[in-house]
């Protein structure tokens, strides 16, 4: 058996994969695969609309928010957010706490003035407290990344922003892993390939008063107004990905909803962080305790800077036991265990057991 700890594209629930397998050739009795369905057909419309409806239910999305299903991933939204929102004042505030928020700020700077509200961090291992932020009350929006996948930094609070300034969150890697109040945000987006489906679809939740404020140069494919007017069917959507995502939403509903996912995430991440904390420094996680991600757990082995030989040996032993894709991001090295919604508690326990055994065999 293989246990997939990939950072994305990531593990999908086995139940969902089996359902996809059963319906692959003949989807819902239609006689054809969902991959062959016209996106304008009634068969596909049922899938598309149910996916949006189930997401609205899972997050209690208020009626004045639109749900869009777009393409281009998170990187596409780095541009789309700026193109659709920055025109209000020409400036935007960016809270840069990791690789992805840094990339988003760089992209947005092509379309307006970006204000970095934090001093440049030497290392992405913390979220400075809000009282140190330099927010501009004239900003078109405030942008942050709720969970930095590479560095394993996850916000433990929702930022407070100046009155009238919309809050924008990239939730690509922790979407549907904990409840949150949608009404605190102007825009929320998430690439599907971490927690909610295969790569290719990006979910956008946008407050309706922010639609229609785009720059003239905004391409139709990134235009929130165009996508909203066309029910996300402006062009051919990633129909198969949306179908699978819809099945994941139903799986979440069957398994305690978003609150159920949050409970599971807390239990799984505690297993790994407890193992790290009880290893007398053999395992080392550089991230401040209060913002350690429940989704992505990065750590070094042997010391704070890592022992290359030990880390290679650990990865080899993990693979021999069926645990794959544990290598850390190339920019930070070490090990990274991604514990998205589909990863089970039992699978996480197997990783914790391996870590404990490896520690006992290799500690000085």
Curated annotation (Swiss-Prot):
Q: How is the cofactor bound?
A: Binds 1 pyridoxal phosphate per subunit.
Listed InterPro entries:
Aminotrans_V_dom, Aminotrans_V_PyrdxlP_BS, Pser_aminoTfrase, PyrdxlP-dep_Trfase, PyrdxlP-dep_Trfase_major, PyrdxlP-dep_Trfase_small
Keywords from UniProt, A to Z, are: Amino-acid biosynthesis, Aminotransferase, Pyridoxal phosphate, Serine biosynthesis, Transferase
Q: Name one GO molecular function term.
A: O-phospho-L-serine:2-oxoglutarate aminotransferase activity
EC number from the UniProt entry: 2.6.1.52
Q: Which residues form a coiled coil?
A: none
What binding partners and quaternary form does the record give?
Homodimer.
Query: Could you tell me what this protein is called?
Result: Phosphoserine aminotransferase
Q: Which organism is it from?
A: Drosophila melanogaster
The record's gene field reads Psat
């Amino acid at each position: 058996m293989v246990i997939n700890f990939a950072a994305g594209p990531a593990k999908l629930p086995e139940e969902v994969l089996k359902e996809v397998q059963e319906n692959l050739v003949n989807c819902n009795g239609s006689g054809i695969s969902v991959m062959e369905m016209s996106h304008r057909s009634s068969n596909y419309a049922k899938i598309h609309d149910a996916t949006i409806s189930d997401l609205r239910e899972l997050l209690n999305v208020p009626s004045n928010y639109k749900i869009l299903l777009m393409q281009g991933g998170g990187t596409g939204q780095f541009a789309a957010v700026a193109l659709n929102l920055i025109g209000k004042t020409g400036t935007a505030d960016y809270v840069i706490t990791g690789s992805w928020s840094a990339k988003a700020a760089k992209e947005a700077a092509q379309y307006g003035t970006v204000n970095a509200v934090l001093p440049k961090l030497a290392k992405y291992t913390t979220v400075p407290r809000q009282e140190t932020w330099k927010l501009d009350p004239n900003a078109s929006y405030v942008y942050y990344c709720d969970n930095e996948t590479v560095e394993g930094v996850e916000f433990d609070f929702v930022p407070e922003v100046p009155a009238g300034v919309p809050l924008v969150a990239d939730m690509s890697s922790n979407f549907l892993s904990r409840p949150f109040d949608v009404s605190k945000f102007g825009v929320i987006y998430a690439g599907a390939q971490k927690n909610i489906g295969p790569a290719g679809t990006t979910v956008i939740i946008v407050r309706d008063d922010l639609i229609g404020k785009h720059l003239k140069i905004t391409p139709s494919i990134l235009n929130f107004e165009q996508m909203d007017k066309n029910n996300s069917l402006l062009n051919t959507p990633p129909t198969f990905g949306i179908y699978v995502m819809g099945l994941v939403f139903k799986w979440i509903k069957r398994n305690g909803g978003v609150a159920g996912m949050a409970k599971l995430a807390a239990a799984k991440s505690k297993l790994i962080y407890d193992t790290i904390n009880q290893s007398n420094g053999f395992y080392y996680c550089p991230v401040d305790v209060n913002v350690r991600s429940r989704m992505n757990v990065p750590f070094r082995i042997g010391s704070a800077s890592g022992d290359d030989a030990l880390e290679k040996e650990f990865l080899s032993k993990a693979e021999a036991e069926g645990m794959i894709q544990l290598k850390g991001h190339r920019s930070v090295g070490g090990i990274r265990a991604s514990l998205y919604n589909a990863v089970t508690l039992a699978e996480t326990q197997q990783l914790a057991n391996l870590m404990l055994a490896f520690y006992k065999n290799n500690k000085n």
